[in-house]
Amino acid sequence: MVIHDLPLKLKDFPMKEKPRERLLKVGAENLANHELLAILLRTGTKHESVLDLSNRLLRSFDGLRLLKEASVEELSSIPGIGMVKAIQILAAVELGSRIHKLANEEHFVIRSPEDGANLVMEDMRFLTQEHFVCLYLNTKNQVIHKRTVFIGSLNSSIVHPREVFKEAFKRSAASFICVHNHPSGDPTPSREDIEVTRRLFECGNLIGIELLDHLVIGDKKFVSLKEKGYL
């Protein structure tokens, strides 16, 4: 009879050594990096446990420092890390990156048009469609929420104040900044841009939530409609 060595799974570990159980008992923040990674990977190989595989993977990428920059090909080239595990790792890294980015955005203080443009420039300058985004601020001009209100050619009949201010009320915003991109790379405001801005400005004055600015994003450049005198 041939005996096959099967991969050692998390359920095969003694209870006190199981990363999942340890996470529940002591909290995720108290687990080592290789334990968290083992929870993602779930299984090792027939020659090593999932914890050993996790340790070896981290050593291959100098810990977490280079792991976040690894490609699917680089990850899957590591023995024991196939395509599925590589994709799981990349998905987890990307989620962590987005959460970190969101946390930074929500503490970002906007004191000038440059601050607002710097916050969104890299995300918006290469978009192939127009995205109309609102940055909602508290009384200290900190960004408390960012929402894409509309995607497509900007039109005053499409960008309805109701959608903009509904989110402002929901977030208890004191003020807001509108941002949208020009896929052409030229941030010169159009007539529609100006009409949308004035309409939202007037509505904001009526209900007490001020439109501070409307930024048009181009390729590494932007225009502030407030600085242009449209607010």
UniProtKB/Swiss-Prot annotation:
Coiled-coil residues: none
Domain MPN: residue ranges: 109-231
GO MF annotation terms: metal ion binding; metallopeptidase activity
Induction: Transcribed under partial control of SigM ECF sigma factor.
PANTHER family, A to Z: DNA REPAIR PROTEIN RADC, UPF0758 PROTEIN YEES-RELATED
Family: Belongs to the UPF0758 family.
Entries under NCBIfam families matching the protein: PRK00024.1 (NF000642), radc (TIGR00608)
Name of the featured protein: UPF0758 protein YsxA
Higher taxonomy: Bacteria, Bacillati, Bacillota, Bacilli, Bacillales
